[in-house]
Swiss-Prot record:
Homodimer. It comes from the Bacteria. It comes from Exiguobacterium sibiricum (strain DSM 17290 / CCUG 55495 / CIP 109462 / JCM 13490 / 255-15). One of its GO terms (biological process) is XMP salvage. It is an enzyme of class 2 (transferase). This is Xanthine phosphoribosyltransferase. It is found in: Cytoplasm. Xanthine binds at L20, N27, K156. The lineage of its organism: Bacteria, Bacillati, Bacillota, Bacilli, Bacillales.
Length: 194
């Protein structure tokens, strides 16, 4: 997605050869116009997939997931990384390791918000090693639902997440695919025209 790549080039900060900071428009401060465009792109790519629900993980995936749910006209639920007092019965959970935070979390969703038979589109802000993606897929499978695909805003293609998901038989649609982070710059896999 050309506009997303331009935002990454203009406002993204390459902190290392592994870390890209995009908190000025995606995962701290949010650019709603860009999120609306991202949602349109995901809607276009998954319009024939029979999506009945969007699932994401707090917090960076919430904005693009919410806008995509709005575009597709389906509900959105996010997996919580910390269990609150109100989320104490009827839950499904999975362990997820965060590359950015360098810690393992137990992600949780109330069973009532992820039902058997649903076709779930998983949306997330980043794909690196695939840990969060597989954790979310485990939640969907535990619920007896089906993963219809993954919509990734920014994919670090130099890390193994995409290939792991493809090898597991999942559909992966990424809007910006980063080939490398080097010398303060992000280089993309393929120039896009969308």
């Amino acid at each position: 997605m050309k506009r997303l790549e331009e935002m990454i080039k203009q406002e993204g900060l390459v902190l290392s050869d592994q870390v890209l900071k995009v908190d000025s428009f995606l995962n701290h401060q949010v650019d709603p116009t860009l999120m609306w465009e991202i949602a349109y792109e995901f809607m276009d790519r998954f319009k024939d997939a029979g999506i009945t629900r969007i699932l994401t993980i707090e917090a960076g995936g919430i904005a693009p997931a919410m806008m995509t749910a709005l575009r597709l006209g389906v509900p959105m639920v996010y997996a919580r990384k910390t269990k609150s007092l109100t989320l104490n019965e009827g839950t499904i959970s999975a362990e997820v390791y965060s590359f950015t935070k360098q810690q393992t979390s137990t992600i949780t969703v109330a069973e009532q918000y992820l039902q058997a038979g649903e076709r779930v589109l998983i949306i997330d802000d980043f794909l690196a090693n695939g840990e969060a993606a597989f954790g979310l897929a485990k939640l969907v499978e535990q619920a007896g639902a089906e993963v219809a695909g993954f919509g990734i805003v920014i994919e670090k293609s130099f890390q193994p997440g995409r290939q792991k998901l493809l090898d597991a038989g999942f559909r992966v649609e990424s809007l910006a695919r980063i080939k490398k982070l080097e010398a303060g710059e992000a280089t993309f896999v393929d120039p896009v025209t969308v």
